[in-house]
From Swiss-Prot:
Highest taxon, organism lineage: Bacteria
Lineage: Bacteria, Pseudomonadati, Pseudomonadota, Betaproteobacteria, Burkholderiales
Keyword Nucleotide-binding: yes
Entry EC number(s): 6.3.1.21
Pathway given in the UniProt record: Purine metabolism; IMP biosynthesis via de novo pathway; N(2)-formyl-N(1)-(5-phospho-D-ribosyl)glycinamide from N(1)-(5-phospho-D-ribosyl)glycinamide (formate route): step 1/1
Protein's UniProt name: Formate-dependent phosphoribosylglycinamide formyltransferase
Record-listed Mg(2+) binding positions: E274, E286
Length: 401
């Protein structure tokens, strides 16, 4: 039986989020609705999640000493990584010492903090189908990997980055140096290391939200949400929809792959498993041990959205992955480089039938920074996609003055 305390009292159940962007913000709201005391941590002040948490803390999360000091001072029951750029070896040390429980596990946080750990686990340890790949530490190694079998076209990504930063497609030899330079500029931390992948001519790509939670028997069970289709531009999601129609054999393969990788990572919580699909064939791409940006669509489509599923699972509560309605999401970009932007057209966006708008509250806007998302539901995904994109297009961030 799960027992929850009262926030801001000696009985409080305390959860610390490491990373407090738009996804963390929704997790924090879901936790607060269950009476959890929340601590939002980020590298900058007034991050979206910090605006709604009981406590806001700002540190360099990649600094092991700062991370250790904060966890020991706050004494949370659970630490929930929401980004990759964290001192994960320190989390492993603290978890091994019994200081804190890391979600889903400290090992999972370490393996998924960069593309190398999780790709080697999936392809080499678990034998899951993936694109051909090589890891490279220099421009010369990158060229040799391409010439040695990866071939063109191919995709180059920093081993650590998010939201498509530093990712590009190479169509021929003339693009190799530019791709290397772009990857070096776009990495989350200065690793100087990339993965180059052979290009898979897939029909579509999906995110399969996979939940490990305690079932009625008291044992950990794996549940799947309906597959989410999405469109990416330069590796960054711009729209998603649910459910993505799939051949039954492809869906079964996707679920087997997701089950295998999440079972190995262990722990409890929601995982975003990214997969490529062509006909009945499925290839593993990536996994995040936390809610996924493409999964924001579940705020319009599921009885329990991905953030509520994550919150419930990590607290040992029952989960329900049932689809409520077809729906879609479309990103609202900043469009301008400014602090404290204002948003015109929200009223017009909400006049689109069966839509909602979420503005993240980020203190600073960039041209390609996600500042919000439009959500829509309908009787079919095509109508929902049209509505979401129309609503998003009506919201116009602008600089003040």
């Amino acid at each position: 039986m799960t027992t929850l305390g009262t926030p801001l009292s000696p009985s409080a159940t305390k959860v610390m989020l490491l990373g407090s962007g738009e996804l963390g913000k929704e997790v924090l709201i879901a936790l607060q609705r269950l009476g959890v005391e929340t601590i939002a941590v980020d590298r900058y002040d007034n991050a979206p999640g910090q605006q709604v948490a009981h406590h806001a803390r700002t540190i360099a999360m990649s600094d092991p000493d700062q991370l250790k000091a904060l966890i020991e001072a706050e004494k949370p029951h659970l630490v929930v990584p929401e980004i990759e750029a964290i001192a994960t070896p320190m989390l492993e040390t603290l978890e091994a010492a019994g200081t804190v429980r890391v979600i889903p596990t400290a090992r999972a946080a370490r393996l998924t903090m960069d593309r190398e750990g999780i790709r080697r686990l999936a392809a080499e340890s678990l034998g899951l189908p993936t694109s051909p790949y090589k890891f490279c530490d220099s421009l010369e190694e990158l060229q040799a990997a391409i010439d040695g079998g990866i071939g063109y076209p191919c995709v180059v990504k920093p081993v650590m980055s998010s939201s498509g930063k530093g990712q590009s497609k190479i169509d021929g030899p003339e693009g190799v140096k530019a791709a290397w330079d772009y990857a070096m500029a776009g990495g989350r931390v200065s690793h100087g290391r990339v993965i180059v992948e052979g290009f898979i001519d897939f029909d579509y790509e999906i995110t399969l939200l996979t939940v490990r939670a305690i079932g009625a028997s008291g044992q950990v069970e794996t549940r799947f949400c309906a597959p989410i289709g999405h469109v990416q531009v330069s590796g960054d999601y711009v729209e998603s929809w649910q459910p993505q129609p799939m051949h039954p054999a492809a869906l079964a393969s996707a679920q087997r792959i997701a089950q295998a990788v999440t079972a190995d990572l262990g722990g409890m919580g929601l995982f975003g498993v990214e997969l490529f699909v062509k006909g009945e064939q499925v290839w593993f791409s990536e996994v995040s041990p936390r809610p996924h940006d493409t999964g924001m669509v579940t705020m319009a489509t599921q009885w329990q959205n991905e953030f509520e599923l994550h919150a419930r699972a990590i607290l040992g509560l029952p989960v329900d992955t049932t689809l409520r309605s077809p729906g879609a999401s479309a990103v609202i970009y900043g469009g301008v480089e400014a602090q404290g932007v204002v948003f015109d057209g929200v009223d017009q966006a909400l006049r689109v039938p069966q839509t909602e708008v979420r503005l993240f509250g980020k203190p600073e806007s960039f041209a390609r920074r996600r500042m919000g998302v439009a959500l829509a539901y309908a009787d079919d995904i095509d109508t929902a996609r049209t509505r979401a994109k129309e609503a998003a297009s009506r919201v116009r961030p602008r600089a003040v003055g």
